[in-house]
Amino acid sequence: MKIQLLSFAALKDFFPPKQELTIDGIQTVLDLKKHLQNQKPEASHLIKVSRISINQIIANDSDSITEGSTVAILPPSSGG
C-alpha cells in the first residue's frame, strides 16, 4: 500500500518533510508508528508522543490507514 507521509518540526531531522511510502502489512496508526520507530530508533520517543492525522483528521492508534492516504506525523510543540 502506498501513502504520502508528511513530517513536521523536529521529526524533519529524521524523515523527509514529504515522502511517498510503501507500507505493506501495515493497517493501523499503531502499526505505522511501530514501523517508523523500527526505521529510526533514535526518533522512537518523539514518534510515540506524536499525533497522527489521516487526510487532515486526527486519528487514534486503532484507526485504519488506507491506500492513497495522506498521513501526517505531528510532534508536540510549544511556543509563546
Model-derived segments and their meaning:
Residues 1-78:
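Ubiquitin-like/PB1-type beta-grasp interaction modules and other compact soluble beta-rich domains
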